[in-house]
Regions:
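Glycine-rich phosphate/pyrophosphate-binding loop and the adjoining helix
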Residues: 63-124
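Helix-loop-strand module that forms the ligand-binding subsite of alpha/beta enzymes
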Residues: 4-69
């Protein structure tokens, strides 16, 4: 998943609204499919954005594909991100890691046996 803008150190509201609906209504169909979030920011907010987006994957039993660093690239104007050598290297490593996981055959056929979900609250 890739976002264009980070607002106040987080993903924009339109993206969050869309992802809330998709993962609420279809999250069970995404289980065991690998996911990776990428944040593109001018300067700050990438790590908070990255964290928020990864929560959609982790609550849906999706393996999260990682890289050598947090999946972010920095730039404000078109073309500026192309100057972020470290960010671009992080994206290349992420792509290789994703390809390896996909080639390994992650999918419903190889999914672990699911347990019946137990719902508890913080206070019993």
């Amino acid at each position: 998943m890739c976002i264009r803008d980070s607002y106040y150190a987080g993903p924009n509201g339109s993206l969050c609204a869309l992802l809330d609906r998709v993962f609420y209504s279809c999250g069970k169909y995404l289980a065991y499919k690998p996911g990776a979030a990428v944040a593109v920011c001018r300067r700050g907010g990438a790590s908070a954005t990255f964290d928020r987006l990864n929560k959609y994957f982790t609550i849906s039993n999706m393996p999260v594909v990682s890289s050598q660093y947090w999946n972010s690239v920095h730039g404000r104007l078109p073309g500026e991100a192309a100057q972020d050598a470290e960010g671009l290297q992080t994206m290349r490593v992420l792509a290789r890691n994703m390809a390896r996981l996909l080639k390994a055959g992650v999918g419903p056929a190889l999914a672990p046996e699911a347990e019946v979900r137990q719902w508890t609250h913080f206070i019993r």
